[in-house]
Amino acid sequence: MRKNILPAGLVFALGAGVSMNALAQAKPDVMVKQRQAVMTLQGKYLGPLVAVAQGKVPYNAAVVQRNAGFLDNLSRMPWDTFDPSTRNEKTRALPAIYENSAKFKEYANRLENETSKLVTLSRGGDEAAVKAQIGAIGKVCGACHDDFRQK
């Protein structure tokens, strides 16, 4: 009986290891869904900030700080899901993402930097500076979409 426990335990451990490894490797369609979810959330938290910057809604420091924090975290999430294995999935992502990955990564870095600046500015209370920074984020988003997203 004791002799069977070790091999059975070994088979279980190896099987669990293989299963865990398979789960760690995301499928292209899953990566696309993940990045689309992140982009949707970015829009959810950027939209109210744009309305503030445009003067369509009153400035609310608490909302600005909260949304800036969410955007800062979200700005770091989607980039690894633009894996070449997702190239043939049906999305609005242009092939240029994979053909000019250095420029795409530059936009990603700029977005991360601009959202970090917004977090810092939102804590300082300078409404004009915050509004200008929201505009800077919008410009990065727009430029990236112009170059890398289907119209």
Language model features: what each stretch is:
Residues 11-12, 22:
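Cleavable N-terminal signal peptides
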